[in-house]
Every structure is written in C-alpha cells, then in structure tokens.
Amino acid sequence: MPIPTPYEDLLRLVLDRGTAKSDRTGTGTRSLFGQQLRYDLSAGFPLITTKKVHLKSVVYELLWFLRGDSNVDWLHRHGVTIWDEWASDTGDLGPIYGVQWRSWPTPSGEHIDQISAALDLLRTDPDSRRIIVSAWNVGEIPRMALPPCHAFFQFYVADGRLSCQLYQRSADLFLGVPFNIASYALLTHMMAAQAGLSVGEFVWTGGDCHIYDNHVEQVRLQLSREPRPYPELILAHRDSIFDYTYDDVVVHNYDPHPAIKAPVAV
C-alpha cells in the first residue's frame, strides 16, 4: 500500500505554482492560499519521514502549552530553545498559546480554561459543534511576542473516533508545519484518551501556505527522498491531560531521513 504523502505533495504544489510574495521578515516567499492535509491517526503517527523532526521539542512544547506557560524558562530546563528568538530578556513571550488555551480572560475578570472546557464537552456532549479552542485573542495580540500562527482548532466525534481540525493562518511549510502536524496529532491522541475515544483524523487547514526563498534548496533535497512508513505512537495512561510527562510519549519505529537545517525567519 502506498505511503500517503500529503505534506510532501503540498511542498511540490507550492514550489510549482506558488506566487512570489513579500513578507514581514523581508525574506520573500512562494505562497498559495487555502490548502488542506488529512491524516488518519489510526494508520500511524504523522511524524514526517523525509527529514528528521525533533520530537523532543514537539513534546515539550505541547506540554508547555498545556501548562498554560508563556516563559521559556521551563523549556530551557528541558533543553528546548525553539522559542528563544521571540522571547524577551526575561524569557517572557506575552499571552501566547498556552495562556489563551488555559486562561482566556473574560470582560468580568474571570478566566476560561478552554482545554478543560473542550474535554468536558467531549465527555458530556460529543456531538456538539462548539468543541473549539482558540489562541487568536484579538484584544491581546499586541502583547504577544508573535501572534498565533496555528490559531484555532475544533474537535469532532463520529462513531467513537475523535478528529481534530486545525486552522493555521500562516504556515512555514518547511520548518514549521511538520512540527505543527506532529504536535496536534499528539494532542488529539491525548484528548481522545482522556475522553475514552479512539483517534480519527487530523485535518490541517492552512491559510498563507509558504516556502521561504531561502528554504527552496532544502525543500528540493527533501522532495528527492523516498518517504518511509509512519511510526506508531504509544501514550501512557494518565488520569488528567495535565499530568502527562515527556516519558509518557513513546514513538516506535521512527526511521526518518537525516535532518535538514535551514534558517528561521524571525
């Protein structure tokens, strides 16, 4: 059976048909608008194999989000530096993802834990069309070190299977998107386990889907490689989604091609 390659197919499409555009970083991109990728999570964990993805950073970043944290100190204690380019001298990033997920401020001065609210709906009203978590808090964007790229996600239950769709307004296809796919696939597994469900699909929807001009050669190298089978995720049991640790996440049979380095556009 052929290995599904929706991510690599999108890279090819943007290389072939992308529009040349300027961008905030001054780097320049090739870009397409409104693209979608689908992964059946029951068929394997979608960790890209045409280059090695740094799984440690994926896992620790997700755990950091789930903590409601927005300072890189906790990441540093675990050897993860992926947010350093945007952090202040004290390590602060403002009210980014984790803060919005766990502590969205209301006009009355209270805070909403969106992750807990989503889990409650999955358990009590799985057919709800309102099982949504948003990081795009317009009133707080000026205080964020970087406005959310992966901004909004929705859960959907059918036949006892949990699916998740993410909307990513800005998609750095070479560096960011493989990371985002793995992160939200892992989150879907965690939410499914906590709600007593099996996993369904992860659906990634991208707005501005771009390849930076200084990533083109790296993308061509990646596309020259033969995809390999996706690995298997083994997730330990925890009583709460907020109790997971790095050691609870085990990926078996991940056999990627070597990593490919590229500069981050800041």
From Swiss-Prot:
Keyword list, A-Z? Cytoplasm, Methyltransferase, Nucleotide biosynthesis, Transferase
* SUPFAM superfamilies noted in UniProt: Thymidylate synthase/dCMP hydroxymethylase (SSF55831)
Q: Which chemical reaction does it catalyze?
A: dUMP + (6R)-5,10-methylene-5,6,7,8-tetrahydrofolate = 7,8-dihydrofolate + dTMP
- In this chain, (6R)-5,10-methylene-5,6,7,8-tetrahydrofolate is annotated as bound at H54, D172, A265
| Xref: HAMAP family | Thymidy_synth_bact
| Assembly and interaction partners | Homodimer.
Protein name, as recorded: Thymidylate synthase
Source species? Mycolicibacterium paratuberculosis (strain ATCC BAA-968 / K-10) (Mycobacterium paratuberculosis)
